[in-house]
From Swiss-Prot:
This is Putative [LysW]-L-2-aminoadipate/[LysW]-L-glutamate phosphate reductase. The keyword Protein transport does not apply. It comes from Aeropyrum pernix (strain ATCC 700893 / DSM 11879 / JCM 9820 / NBRC 100138 / K1). GO terms for biological process: arginine biosynthetic process via ornithine; L-arginine biosynthetic process; lysine biosynthetic process via aminoadipic acid. Involved in both the arginine and lysine biosynthetic pathways. Pfam families: Semialdhyde_dh (PF01118), Semialdhyde_dhC_1 (PF22698). SUPFAM superfamilies: Glyceraldehyde-3-phosphate dehydrogenase-like, C-terminal domain (SSF55347), NAD(P)-binding Rossmann-fold domains (SSF51735). The keyword Membrane does not apply. Its EC number is 1.2.1.103, 1.2.1.106. Belongs to the NAGSA dehydrogenase family. Type 1 subfamily. LysY sub-subfamily. Transmembrane segments: none annotated. Its main location: cytoplasm. It is an enzyme of class 1 (oxidoreductase).
C-alpha cells in the first residue's frame, strides 16, 4: 500500500481551517503532519475545534516559524489574505504542491491586489502559474497542477449562476450581469466584529461593499475566459441571518428571440458532465423546488437554477452552495485530489445535511 500523502495546513484554527480538518479526517489517503495557529500553538486541534475531539489525537498546533515546509507533499494555505503569499511561494519553489484558500493567487492581474486587498503582491511571477480551482471550468487544468487558487465563496456561487448564460451567449453581453448575493455569517470568519456578532446579525439583512466587491474581479476573470472578451458585472453581497450558505442571483437581459427553451439547453449543456451540480429550471407549472442552501449544507453540491421573465426579456440564474465546503475547504480538497492523482471526489462524497 502506498504511503499517505503528507499535508500541512497554514492557519488551521479558523473556520475554513476547521472545515478543512473535518473533511481531511475522512480522507483515506491523507495524513495531516502539521497545522499552524498563532493563538493555539502547542495546544490540541480540538481546542479551537471542539467538534473534532477524538480526531487528530496526536496533533498539536504549531507556530509558522517552527514548520518544515519540505516535510510535506501538499500545503493548504488558510491564512488571511496577504499573510501567506511568500510562504506559498517558498513551498512552490521547494516542489511542494500548494492549495491556497486565500485570495493571494486567484487574480492574474497583479495591479488589482493593492486596490482590492491592500497589498502589493510579493510574487506576481506566480500568478499565471496558479490554476483557479473551479471544477466545472478548470477541472482539466487542475490535474497535475502545482499551485491551485481556491475561489472565493461569493465568486463561486456567482460564477455557477452566470457561467451558462455567458458561455451560451444567450444574453446581451453589453448590458452585462448584476449579481445579488445572500451570504451567511460564517463567511466573516471566526473573529467577532461589530456586524458579525449574533445580537446584530440575527434577524438582520443588509448590503455590504456595494461599490465593488472583491469577488466580482474573480467572476469577471472567469467569465472573460469563457467567451474571450470583457464583460460588465456588478456583484452586491448582502449579510443575512444564516450560519452557512451563499445564494447568488445573476440578472441579465436575454438577446432578442431567446426564451425559456434556449435557457434550458444552456444550463443543461454547461453542467451535463458535473456530478455535483443539480440543475433546477423554474417556470409556472414546473414541479421543481428552487435552489435552496438548506439542500446543500455540509456538502460539495451546488443547486443551480434559472427563471425567464418573458415580458421584460430578462433571465435570472441562481446558485446555492455551502460557503465553507463548496465555497472553500471542499473545493480545496477537490483541487488536491486532482493535483495528486486521487479520485477527484475522495473524501467529498458525503450527502448534504438537512434540516
Amino acid at each position: 500500500m502506498a504511503r499517505a500523502v503528507r499535508a500541512g495546513i497554514l492557519g488551521a484554527s479558523g473556520m475554513t481551517g476547521g472545515e478543512l480538518l473535518r473533511i481531511l479526517a475522512s480522507h483515506p489517503g491523507v495524513e495531516v503532519e502539521w497545522a499552524t495557529s498563532r493563538e493555539y500553538a502547542g495546544k490540541p486541534v480540538h481546542t479551537a475545534h471542539p467538534h473534532l475531539r477524538g480526531f487528530y489525537t496526536g496533533l498539536k498546533y504549531t507556530s509558522i516559524d517552527k514548520i518544515d515546509i519540505g516535510e510535506v507533499d501538499v500545503v493548504f494555505n488558510a491564512l488571511p489574505h496577504g499573510v501567506g503569499a511568500s510562504i506559498v511561494a517558498e513551498a512552490y519553489e521547494n516542489g511542494v504542491r500548494v492549495v491556497d484558500l486565500s485570495a493571494d493567487y486567484r487574480l492574474r492581474d497583479q495591479s488589482l491586489y493593492p486596490k482590492l486587498y491592500g497589498f502589493k503582491h510579493p510574487r506576481p511571477d506566480l500568478l499565471e502559474e496558479a490554476i483557479y480551482a473551479l471544477p466545472e471550468i478548470y477541472g482539466e487544468k487542475l490535474r497535475g497542477a502545482r499551485l491551485a487558487a481556491v475561489p472565493g465563496c461569493n465568486a463561486t456561487a456567482a460564477i455557477l449562476a452566470a457561467a451558462p448564460l455567458v458561455a451560451s451567449k444567450i444574453i446581451d453581453m453589453d448590458v452585462g450581469i448584476i449579481v445579488d448575493v445572500k451570504a451567511a455569517s460564517s463567511e466573516a470568519g471566526s473573529k467577532p466584529s461589530r456586524h458579525s456578532i449574533h445580537p446584530l446579525r440575527e434577524g438582520s439583512a443588509r448590503p455590504y461593499t456595494p461599490w465593488g466587491h472583491r469577488h466580482a474581479a474573480e467572476a469577471v476573470q472567469v467569465l472573460r475566459d469563457l467567451v474571450g472578451r470583457g464583460i460588465r458585472l456588478s456583484l452586491v453581497p448582502h449579510a443575512v441571518s444564516m450560519t452557512r450558505g451563499v445564494l447568488a442571483s445573476a440578472h441579465a437581459l436575454l438577446r432578442d428571440n431567446i426564451g425559456f427553451s434556449e435557457a434550458v439547453r444552456a444550463y443543461a449543456s454547461f453542467y451535463k458532465d458535473s456530478q455535483i451540480v443539480r440543475v433546477k429550471p423554474m417556470a409556472p407549472g414546473l414541479p421543481v423546488d428552487p435552489p435552496d442552501v438548506k439542500n446543500v449544507i455540509g456538502s460539495m453540491f451546488a443547486e443551480v437554477g434559472f427563471a425567464v421573465e418573458e415580458e421584460s426579456g430578462r433571465i435570472t440564474g441562481f446558485a446555492a452552495i455551502d460557503n465553507l465546503v463548496r465555497g472553500a475547504a471542499g473545493q480545496a480538497v477537490y483541487a488536491m485530489n486532482a493535483m495528486l492523482g486521487f479520485d477527484e471526489w475522495e473524501g467529498l462524497r458525503s450527502p448534504p445535511l438537512r434540516p
